[in-house]
């Protein structure tokens, strides 16, 4: 099963403090492993604060300052000093990976210079770090009933308030978090 462009949603019973109530957007899944971005855990810095710290030269005027007030997200515990921008494709950035026809992940600074300007992607989120699994590791966690899987919905990523994304992802499955059991049954 290819999990690219799916959500991993932490089961309510997950006791790993790193991933409790996490929603992870899977960007890559193949025989070598899995890479995704957690989309529902902000860090204590805004996008403007992060951009001020890295001192990018921005030749275009800031015309959408409100977009720079959004929080940066904690994408996961791996390489948490690296930035990842999940966005609707626009232009050609130096280091982008197309996840779907609609979504790309970019890791180069050239996209950061567009944020807040007329050249910014239509919709985007910025995360520091990513969530990663070695070959077979995620499949093992799935067999242990650690995660729920569902096809990704861009409205959860870009239009749902951050604190509501976990609950919303579960609701898309048609279930309530209180009705989920961590026990695996056998018929």
UniProtKB/Swiss-Prot annotation:
UniProt cross-references to SUPFAM superfamilies, sorted A to Z: VC0467-like
InterPro entries noted in UniProt: AlgH-like
Protein name: UPF0301 protein VSAL_I0547
Upper lineage: Bacteria, Pseudomonadati, Pseudomonadota, Gammaproteobacteria, Vibrionales
GO CC terms in record: cytosol
Superkingdom field: Bacteria
Alphabetized Pfam families for the sequence: DUF179
Family, per entry: Belongs to the UPF0301 (AlgH) family.
